[in-house]
Amino acid sequence: MKSILSFLIDAKRCEIAELKRLAQTSGLVDGIGGLVHALQRERGLSNLYLASGGSRSLEALMAQHRLTDQLVQLSAQTFEGLDVEAHPAAHGARLFARVALAAQGLSVLDALRQRVLACAENTVRTSAAYARLIDALLAVVFEAADSAADPAISRLLVALFNFSQGKELAGQERAAGSALFAAGQAQAEAQQRLMRLIDSQERCFLVFAEFSGESLRARWRDLQAVEGVAKLEHLRRVLLSTPPAQPLDVEASQSWFDACTQRLDAMRGIEVELTAELQARCRERLRAANDDLRGLQTRLARGEASLGADAFEFFADTVGGSVPPVQASAGAVGPQLERSVHELVHAQAQQLQAMSAELEAVRASLQERKLIERAKGVLMAHRQLSEEDAHSTLRRLAMDQGKRLVEVAEALLAMAPMLPTEPR
């Protein structure tokens, strides 16, 4: 049989392969963030253009098309550079399915643009089309967050996904408000949608704050205090408090767009910082893992392949099923050449146990989101509801029953086979 150190070396090599995959994924996530930001701006300008009947924002929209196209090309190159062999079978299947859907959406983007330029679409359908494309791109980020095996990296990915999701909802708010102002008249349905978008993005930012570091939380708090956000809050009140069918200032559409854009650009800065922290963490963990590997290989070369006098220590301290503790001064596994092979084995076991517990907590957030999304899908299929209406229905049920949203989602999924389908 191979020596114990040989197995530890194999484990470390697997860890390094996983960290390399995460480093590649973090680069993909960075590129997607830039493309999504460009598409969000393109959507807002498209709504300004459509709501004005083609009389406003054409030059800015065409310039944005060119900028977005550059980022589409970069993302396409990143997609093509993904290494299938580097991804475990189950995760790879999901990731590449997500990438395929996103690539399909990008391939028909020009067709959507042509309909917008011809004023053959309205603002609602256009916003929904861009939202589907952006959701497909963010799903790639979600898949990355759902597959990370390192707790610290997983936490950053969860924070990033929720922040990006909140930013997308803020982008939808920009587009919806631009169209509402440009239409020149308050509309009850559009006002209700704005309120839902504002509420939903705040929930995403709460999750971001839970999983991000203090420096990023401070940046987020500082963003709430800038002058542009105060102006945005004022324009929000105008949009939401104007009675339906009453006039709105058409000229305020540009002010609204600019205020939202200032906020979204600042949010993009936080997103970039979060992505940079993610990439730095990947590099840091990769360096540490390589150091560990070299340390283990050195010990193996020195012939430290057996437990020697420490052999019986495997059974020590096992009253109650506890694992023998490792001294706090042990530090990282690899470079500590004075430690026994026995300690190395238990250090590896203890590290894996701690990682497993922390990952369980991090992934609970992702699992809740999956359940809620599935429950929304059930409502959309059985009640013929839009995604927003399905989410509102779940929230109303949760409030009425005094339960958490995920508890209502679980109950609904359990009853799904018995739900009748309403005719279209």
List the predicted regions and their residue ranges.
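Hydrophobic alpha-helical segments
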Residues: 1-315, 369
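Short secondary-structure transition/capping segments
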Residues: 262, 322-325, 333, 404-409
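Recognition helices and adjacent regulatory flanks at domain boundaries
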Residues: 345-403, 407-424
